[in-house]
């Protein structure tokens, strides 16, 4: 009787699990279950190491250089990401040169605003004793923005407008255009330990208004590589431009440091959650 009771209880337990869970893989007498209503958070940086992932929903919204530093450089552990939200009156208007098949370059009106800053991993340094260490930092467009020299020059005009009129700046100076990514050096005296060098990246949103551009997105992306223009909502196309900020800093290694954000996940999130960084309307 006891064996029959145990068998019935076991079957009832399995039935309950199958009501709440689904089998996602099975083999070698092992079943891997997943809750039927399970929905991974889109805002997670990645799903590899849940404990060290920062939820984008918890990111702060800032509008100044100091606020970026406060939440990323000065905080322990630092937030790996913040939204940047400027009033619509601060948006910079510019002209973007886009190449069209059989038409050549055309000037397209765009509005530009910084929309986020994220902490980028640069390199790790094990330090023995107390030394003045020469370390790396990056300047220019990050290596995720690969485009033609004409497009980079056109994009740079809008960026320079933001640099001269907003309280969020890159800290670097350029002559005519923002350069492709370059490695620079800087030094800091460090005590013995394991250190990680990080540097913030500013992400700028370039907004093309007008639903009339929607049919041409594929063509614009084909002949203007690197922009990855996407159509969002009914009235605008957007592409994002990442530019390194001159603020490399070191952190002594600690287990509770957040993982760096994954750029592709970040860009998708920014596109789908414009209310986090876009005030709406035009200047």
UniProtKB/Swiss-Prot annotation:
<dbReference type="GO" id="GO:0006974">
    <property type="term" value="P:DNA damage response"/>
</dbReference>
<keyword id="KW-0963">Cytoplasm</keyword>
<dbReference type="InterPro" id="IPR040927">
    <property type="entry name" value="BB_PF"/>
</dbReference>
<dbReference type="GO" id="GO:0050708">
    <property type="term" value="P:regulation of protein secretion"/>
</dbReference>
<dbReference type="GO" id="GO:0031159">
    <property type="term" value="P:positive regulation of aggregate size involved in sorocarp development"/>
</dbReference>
<dbReference type="InterPro" id="IPR038768">
    <property type="entry name" value="SmlA"/>
</dbReference>
<comment type="function">
    <text>Knockout of the gene for this protein causes small aggregate formation. May regulate the secretion or processing of a secreted factor that regulates aggregate size.</text>
</comment>
<dbReference type="GO" id="GO:0045335">
    <property type="term" value="C:phagocytic vesicle"/>
</dbReference>
<dbReference type="GO" id="GO:0042593">
    <property type="term" value="P:glucose homeostasis"/>
</dbReference>
<dbReference type="GO" id="GO:0051156">
    <property type="term" value="P:glucose 6-phosphate metabolic process"/>
</dbReference>
<dbReference type="GO" id="GO:0007165">
    <property type="term" value="P:signal transduction"/>
</dbReference>
<dbReference type="GO" id="GO:0005829">
    <property type="term" value="C:cytosol"/>
</dbReference>
<dbReference type="Pfam" id="PF18063">
    <property type="entry name" value="BB_PF"/>
</dbReference>
<protein>
    <recommendedName>
        <fullName>Small aggregate formation protein</fullName>
    </recommendedName>
</protein>
């Amino acid at each position: 009787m006891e064996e029959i009771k145990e068998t019935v209880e076991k079957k009832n337990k399995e039935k309950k699990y199958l009501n709440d869970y689904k089998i996602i893989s099975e083999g070698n007498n092992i079943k891997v279950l997943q809750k039927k209503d399970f929905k991974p958070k889109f805002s997670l940086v990645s799903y590899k190491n849940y404990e060290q992932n920062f939820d984008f929903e918890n990111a702060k919204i800032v509008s100044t250089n100091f606020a970026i530093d406060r939440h990323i450089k000065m905080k322990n552990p630092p937030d790996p990401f913040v939204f940047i939200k400027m009033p619509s009156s601060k948006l910079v208007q510019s002209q973007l040169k886009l190449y069209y098949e059989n038409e050549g370059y055309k000037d397209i009106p765009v509005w530009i605003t910084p929309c986020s800053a994220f902490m980028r991993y640069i390199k790790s340094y094990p330090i023995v004793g107390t030394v003045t260490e020469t370390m790396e930092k990056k300047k220019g467009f990050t290596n995720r923005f690969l485009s033609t020299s004409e497009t980079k020059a056109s994009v740079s005009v809008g960026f320079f407008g933001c640099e001269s009129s907003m309280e969020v700046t890159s800290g670097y100076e350029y002559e005519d255009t923002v350069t492709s990514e370059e490695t620079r050096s800087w030094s800091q005296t460090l005590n013995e330990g394991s250190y990680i060098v990080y540097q913030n990246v500013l992400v700028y949103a370039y907004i093309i208004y007008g639903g009339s551009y929607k049919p041409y997105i594929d063509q614009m992306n084909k002949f203007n590589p690197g922009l990855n223009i996407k159509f969002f909502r009914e009235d605008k196309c957007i592409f994002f431009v990442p530019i390194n900020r001159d603020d490399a800093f070191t952190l002594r290694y600690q287990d509770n440091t957040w993982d760096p954000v994954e750029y592709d996940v970040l860009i998708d999130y920014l596109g789908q959650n414009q209310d986090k960084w876009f005030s709406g309307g035009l200047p």
